[in-house]
Amino acid sequence: MLQLQPSAVATTIQQGGVIAYPTEAVFGLGCDPDNDSAIEKLLVVKQRPWQKGLILVASSFEQLLPYLDITQLTEQQLQFAQSKWPGPFTFVMPIQSHVSKLLCGEFDSIAVRVSAHPVVRELCDTLNKPLVSTSANLAGEQPVVDAQHIITDFSDKIDALILGKLGEQRQPSTIIDARSGQILRNGS
């Protein structure tokens, strides 16, 4: 497992690799959202059922647009989401019909966040697209907040680890349904 800087990991991601990287609150596992093989590998590493869906993180709302059907959202709903970004708010938004079921699971929507974390932003800027994101832990276990645990638990399962500091958040992001405004999970 390579330990690299964000810009050096872009090739690993583009080649279908799964990486671990710091986020606002915990270490995340990520891959290319347009590569079903990479998503399948990530789901196996995490031992997460595909039906649950995943999150996309981005450095800008524009990076998320190819995946979202914003025609199902009002201008006010879009403005509300954008007023919370970048930051620790994840919004569940309707997807375009071409989006892989591996990303959205059994849903007609996907969770998306525009991150304020510098590593996530640099990764997404380098890739010029969002990144699949899920907490670095096995399904049902506590998320990892220490790079050493990534090395211990995932070194033979992932392709790269980006070393870096976690953000200041101690709780996962708040999740809001963009259509209804309902808070699905209280977080930071």
Curated annotation (Swiss-Prot):
BP GO annotations: regulation of translational fidelity; tRNA threonylcarbamoyladenosine modification
GO MF, one example: L-threonylcarbamoyladenylate synthase
Pfam families per UniProt: Sua5_yciO_yrdC
Reactions catalysed: L-threonine + hydrogencarbonate + ATP = L-threonylcarbamoyladenylate + diphosphate + H2O
Gene3D superfamilies in alphabetical order: DHBP synthase
Enzyme class: transferase
The protein's role, per its UniProt record: Required for the formation of a threonylcarbamoyl group on adenosine at position 37 (t(6)A37) in tRNAs that read codons beginning with adenine. Catalyzes the conversion of L-threonine, HCO(3)(-)/CO(2) and ATP to give threonylcarbamoyl-AMP (TC-AMP) as the acyladenylate intermediate, with the release of diphosphate.
UniProt xrefs under NCBIfam families: L-threonylcarbamoyladenylate synthase (TIGR00057)
Name under which the protein is recorded: Threonylcarbamoyl-AMP synthase
Lineage, opening ranks: Bacteria, Pseudomonadati, Pseudomonadota, Gammaproteobacteria, Alteromonadales
